[in-house]
Amino acid sequence: MKVLILSADGFEDLELIYPLHRIKEEGHEVYVASFQRGKITGKHGYTVNVDLAFDEVDPDEFDALVLPGGRAPEIVRLNEKAVAITKKMFEDGKPVASICHGPQILISAGVLKGRKGTSTVTIRDDVKNAGAEWIDAEVVVDGNWVSSRHPGDLYAWMREFVKLLR
């Protein structure tokens, strides 16, 4: 399977780096997309290679999507192409994993109405206002959507996401 990660500078380091390596460990191809090719830097200084610019991504070529948190989703959600990629993959029923502030992109894509999920508590009201039921749990699985709250939930988050990739 081909898995896409959407992010930008300011990502929560472990929320991108752990899924990147964990998904590869399962034998899947993982691609990072951002505003442009090159590198992005996390909140704590880790850098990650960017394989594709948002404008180069064809969502039909990917089987699953990961939306890490940190500050990155605040700016990723402003990119129309990134939001369109997210909307298409979510609505096509492809596995989508979000953590922390990652659901901000799902909110902008308008796909959360009637769904159950979680996020960092600081965007709880935003998730609810988008029509989702917010649940305070380390991981929530609702169909193709796997969501978690923060880095402390990484292991449960990836455990459940990897199940959807099998």
UniProtKB/Swiss-Prot annotation:
Example of a GO cellular component annotation carried by this entry: cytoplasm
EC number of the protein: 3.5.1.124, 3.4.22.-
Subcellular location: Cytoplasm
One GO MF term: peptidase activity
SUPFAM superfamilies registered for this protein in UniProt: Class I glutamine amidotransferase-like
Gene Ontology BP annotations: proteolysis
This protein's UniProt keywords: Cytoplasm, Hydrolase, Protease
Pfam families to which the protein is assigned, alphabetical: DJ-1_PfpI
Domain spans labelled PfpI endopeptidase: 1-166
Claim: Protease is one of the keywords in the record: yes
Domain of life the protein comes from: Archaea
Function: Deglycase that catalyzes the deglycation of the Maillard adducts formed between amino groups of proteins and reactive carbonyl groups of glyoxals. Thus, functions as a protein deglycase that repairs methylglyoxal- and glyoxal-glycated proteins, and releases repaired proteins and lactate or glycolate, respectively. Deglycates cysteine, arginine and lysine residues in proteins, and thus reactivates these proteins by reversing glycation by glyoxals.
Record text on subunit structure and interactions: Homohexamer formed by a dimer of trimers that assemble into a hollow ring structure.
UniProt similarity note: Belongs to the peptidase C56 family.
Name used for this protein in its record: Deglycase TK1284
Organism: Thermococcus kodakarensis (strain ATCC BAA-918 / JCM 12380 / KOD1)
